[in-house]
C-alpha cells in the first residue's frame, strides 16, 4: 500500500481533507499567519539552576526537519464495536511490531538498541524514564466501562523495546498522577519490574506532590490565574519523559492530545472562577484568547520540555470526544489501527489534529495552542493533509504493516 493510501480504502465517499494536499500546503501558511497576526510573544522567565539530580537530555537538542511517523496495521484490533470491552480485541504481537517499526523509521537506527541510544542519550542504570499515559476516564480501580482510555498494549510494546535495547525495567515509571490505573490495565502488564504509579493507590505506588524542587512549580502568566500548580515529584526525579496520549477530540479544548495529557501531571486543576484553566482552553468561552494557553505554559516547564524524548500517539481506536466509546472512522473504514511517533511534541499534535479534523472537523482554534507552542520554542507547527503529501516543514512518514 502506498503512503498516499494512508492505511484505508479511500472510496468516493471519503472526505478530501481541506481540499487536498496542494490546498493544505499553500493555504495553511496564510491561515496560520492570520491566526497569529497581532500576537505578542510570551515573556519567558529566567531558567532556574537545578541540582545535578535533574538531568536534561534535551537541553542542547538540535533536530533536523521534524519527523512524524504513522504506522498502520489492519490486524492490530478486531473489535466489532458491539461485543464486550474493546480492549479485549487488541493483538499485542502486532502492536509490538508497529511500535518497533515506528521507532526504526523515526530514528533511522538499525535495531532497538540503536533507536533507543538516540532517544535516551546518556542513559545508564538508575536514570528513570517517566511514561505518561492517559486514564482520564477511569473513575475506579475496577473500572469496566467502554469509554476510551489508555490501552496496555502500546505500553507493553514500549517497555519491551526499551528492555530489548538494554534499559533496566526498574528504571521505567508508567504514571497518571491525577487518575487511577485500573486492574484491567495493570494486571495485563507484561513486565513486572516496571513501576505503575497513579493518584489513588490502585497500582504499585501513589504519585506524590511534595514540591521536592521549585522547578516543578507551574505559574501562569494570565493575571486571573493566581494559584500555582505543581507537577508530580517523579518528573523531577526522572531523567527522561515519554508522552503517550490518545487520538481523540474533547468537549472543552477541541482536542485532547499530547499537550493536554500533562493536565494529568498536575496536583490540581481546580480553582474558583477565573482561576481555573479550563475556560482558557475553551474557544467558546469569553475568557479564551489566542495569546494564552495554560497547556503551553504547563508543557514549557523544563521538567517536561527538556526531558521529553518521545511522544507515542495511541490511535488504535481513537474517539470523537473526551468521554466517548470508540466508534468506526469513515476515514479509516473502521478503527484507525495506528500508532504515531515523534520526537517533536508540537509536530505530532499537529498531525493528530489533522487526522481528527479530516474525520470529524475541528474549529481553527484547535491549532491555537500549537502555534503558541512553536513561539515558545517547544516544536514545529504546521497543518497539512496526512492522507497525502500535505506537509512542507514536517517530515511525515507512513508505514504499512
Regions found by a protein language model. Name each.
Residues 60-125, 136-145, 149-157, 164-401:
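Extended, low-polarity segments enriched in aliphatic/aromatic residues
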Residues 19:
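Phosphate-coordinating loops and pocket residues in cytosolic domains that bind phosphorylated ligands
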Residues 27-30, 349:
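Alpha-helix initiation and N-capping motif
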Residues 1-12, 23-27, 35-42:
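N-terminal secretory signal peptides
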